[in-house]
Each structure stands twice: as structure tokens, then as C-alpha cells.
């Protein structure tokens, strides 16, 4: 038994060896081109550089098997493919994320990869991976990003964004354009920028701060926080509370609802709006005077604040509603 244990231990220790593959390619292009990256596993990072006139690609892959020959065979059977067609650069790498365990928690089979691309600012990107995160920064052009196994991060993008992940959170910072983001496995965090925003998650909370433009957001798995939004707001959660700090003057309609918590709104004392606040699971209170329309009830408050204005609708089935002065 001791001999068997020792052999198993030594076998597990030998798994630590791995074979690495490094590739660097450069393609001459002009602004206004397209980048396409389709990989079976690994993270993708795209960075736009001012004044750049080429696309530079760095590839790092690491394959772990029980022996070197299997690792080298995998790399040979799954090459990285580069194609340039005019002003379009395409990178493809077949293969799937592969993890399996041996005794003592050591990796028996493992595939890792990281793809880094530097390109001109004015470039459109289409990125897809089944096994890692995607990050894009400083691009002036449309961004399409899809991953099944990691988060998404967009920074300083000037153009439309379509981002989807089944396995992580999404962060958007200082981006301007028509933004559509969706995740089944994490939260959404947006700060700065403007345009239009549509965001949905089944697995976390949503925080939107200092965005200039209309937003429509929804989550089944967390709370919602919105602060300093210049534009219409529509947000719903089935799994948490809602917190909002509203800009003054309020210039657009606001609709916030939850099935799983309270709603807490802060607004300046001189803000003018039409309030419609209703709850099935608590009370409604307001620090600001409300000229009531209809009957006064503990669970429903409807009327005008400071002579009225855009609609502020607050509805919850699972908590109280509080409107507070900033």
C-alpha cells in the first residue's frame, strides 16, 4: 500500500511540466479595418494605440499533459491561423478549454492561452472565446465580444458595443455609443460615458454611475444602484433592493421596480417631478412635500413634488420605499 501511494504521488508530481508556444505576427493596415478573433480557449486583450499603422498580435499558449510528446502533438494538431484579406485581419485557433484532475489535485490535462492585439484606434473588432475573459480599450469602432468562460471589460470605447458572457461580470468605463451587454454569471458595472445602455444579468447586481443617455437594465440575481444618470431610467430586479441618486433638474421619466427588496431614492429638495410610489410589502415615505392625488395610503403615494415634472415611478413587492433629500 505504501508503495502504491508513493507511485501515485510521484505520478502526480510529474504533471507540473508543460509545453509553451509563443507567436508574434505583424500586419500592415490602415485605419477603418476589421479584426476578427475566434479561439476555443484563452483570454483576449485588444488595445488601440494612437498613430499606429499595423496590427500586432502576441500569442501565448501553454499545454499541460502527462508527457511532452502529447503536448507538442496537441500544438501541432491545433495551429494558430492568421489571415489578412485587405484591411481585415483574422486570427483563429481551434480547440477547447480542457481541464481534468489527477490525484492530489494536480492538473493532468490543461489548456491555457492569452492573445494580445495592438491595433489602430479606428478599427472594428469581433472577438469570441469559449474559455477566458475579453478586454478591449481605446478603440474607435464597433466592438462585438462573446465569451462562455470569463468576464468582459470595455474601456474608453467610441462606438457600438455588443457584449455577452455566460461566465463572468461585465465592466464598462468611459465608453460612448449604443451599448448592449448581457451576462448569465456575474454583475454589471458601468461608469462614465454616454449614448444608450441596455444591460441584463441573471447572476449579480447592476451599478450604473455618471452615464449620459437613456438606460434600460434588469437583473434576476442582485440589487440595482444608479447615480447621476442624465436621461431616462428603466430598471427592474427580482433579487434585491434599488438605490438611486437622481440628478437635478429631473429631465426624463424614471421607472424603478423590484420584487425582492426596498427602493431608496435620494434627490435634491428643489427637484420637480410627478411621484408614483407603491409597495405590497412595506410603507412609503418622502422627505419632500407631496401634493397628493387621490387617496392617501400607507402603501401608495401619488402626487406632485415642487409643482410636478417628469414621472418618477417606484414599485416594489418586497419592501419599503423611501424618498430622501440629498
Q: How would you describe each model-predicted region?
A:
Residues 1-326:
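Intrinsically disordered, low-complexity terminal regions
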